Amino acid sequence: MEELEMKVFEAFAKDWALVTAGSMDRFNTMTIGWGAMGTLWGKSAVTVYVKPVRYTHEYLDANEYFTVCFFPKDYKKDLSLLGSRSGRDGDKVAETALTPVAVEGSVGFAQASLTLLCKKIYRQDMDTAAMPEDVVKRNYEVEAPHTMYIGEVVKVL
């Protein structure tokens, strides 16, 4: 596995990323601001969090692979759009300057400065009973909690 040099605490929260699952003929992507990178079971891993109401959730559940793509700051407007519209309502990617590309069993984007191809190795719905009360009030009083997806990083592009 290649070494990555990045500010991991800013990569998700400040710079954002796209998580994408599916194939070139049928995929969905969404902007994520929560995530983690590290190791699990001796493997390089990425964790992403997606609410069950999001269209991308269906694709993550149905597919073995997903990508996490990071972009130069010039694409922040595109990531904002992809995080505010649903793929259920049409081709939101067509409204951006991003070009989808096939990535060995999933989909990435030509403009990404970093693409992590991940094989899904764990999926778990988060349990509000195990969370601090203030976190539940702030994030989960209206909608169900996120699903956590952990992917083994099988390729860095």
Can you name each region flagged by the protein language model?
Residues 1-157:
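Basic, polyanion-binding surface patches
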